[in-house]
Amino acid sequence: MKKTQTWIITCIYLQLLLFNPLVHSQGICRNRVTDDVKDVTKLVANLPKDYMITLKYVPGMDVLPSHCWISEMVEQLSVSLTDLLDKFSNISEGLSNYSIIDKLVKIVDDLVECMEEHSFENVKKSSKSPEPRQFTPEKFFGIFNKSIDAFKDLEIVASTMSECVISSTSSPEKDSRVSVTKPFMLPPVAASSLRNDSSSSNRKASNSIEDSSLQWAAVALPAFFSLVIGFAFGALYWKKKQPNLTRTVENRQINEEDNEISMLQEKEREFQEV
C-alpha cells in the first residue's frame, strides 16, 4: 500500500514539473517586478501635487502594442527616476521618499537588463524620438504603473514582422476654433481602396491571432499528452500491483483462520487432558 501511495505522489510531482513551463510561459520579465511597486501610492502622496517630473515620453504608448514602446520607455523611466533620486537627501526627512525611489530604480534597472536579454528583433520602430515632457507625480507614476503592468504579460513577439509605426493619417487634436464643416465624401475609387486596406489589416490581425494560438497550442499540447501518459503509467502500475495486493490479503486471512483453528485445537487438547 505504501509503494502505491509513493507512486501516486511521484506521478503528481511529475505532472507539476511538466506543467511548470506552461505556467511560466507568460511574462518574460515578470519575476523582475517585486512588491516594492506598491509603495508608489505612498510616494505620490508624499510629493507635492504641482511638482513636475521630466520624462522623455515615447510616442504611441497609448495606441501601439506594449512590445513597441516598452523597451525604450523603461530606459527613459530609469533616467527620470535616477534624476529624481538625486534630488532627495539620503538622510532625515527625505529618507522615506529616497528609499522608495531607490527601490523603484533598482526594479527599472532590472527590467532594462531583462529587455537587453530578450530583444525584439522583428519590430519596425517608429522614426519619432521620445519627447521631453513635464508630468505631475500622479501622471508620471501612472505611466510607470502602466509600464510595470505591461511587463507582467509581456511575451516575445512572433517571428512575423510586427509594425510599430504610428499612422501618419491619424487625426490631430481638435482645435476649438475650427468650424464645423460638411462631411467629406470620398470618390468610389478611394472608398474601394480604403476598404481593401481595411480588409488587409483585418487579415494581418487574424494572422497574428492565429500565430499566438499556434504558440499556445505548441506549449499546451505536449503538457497535455505528458499528463495523459503519466496517468496511463500510473493506472498500469496500479493494475499490475492490484493482484499482488489481493493475494496478500487472502494469505493474511488464511493465516488468521489457521491460527484460530490451531488455538481451538490446543484448547480442546487441554480440556481433554483435564
UniProtKB/Swiss-Prot annotation:
UniProt keyword annotations, A-Z: Cell adhesion, Cell membrane, Cell projection, Cytoplasm, Cytoskeleton, Disulfide bond, Glycoprotein, Growth factor, Membrane, Pyrrolidone carboxylic acid, Secreted, Signal, Transmembrane, Transmembrane helix
Glycosylated position list: N90, N97, N145, N196
Regions crossing the membrane: 216-238
Region forming the signal peptide: 1-25
Side of membrane Cytoplasmic, spans: 239-274
Record's subcellular location: Cytoplasm; Cytoplasm, Cytoskeleton; Cell membrane; Cell projection, Lamellipodium
Record-linked InterPro entries: 4_helix_cytokine-like_core (IPR009079), SCF (IPR003452)
GO biological process: cell adhesion; positive regulation of cell population proliferation
Disulfide-bond pairs as recorded: C29-C114, C68-C164
Record PTM: A soluble form is produced by proteolytic processing of the extracellular domain.
Family: Belongs to the SCF family.
Protein name in UniProt: Kit ligand
Organism: Capra hircus (Goat)
Name of encoding gene: KITLG
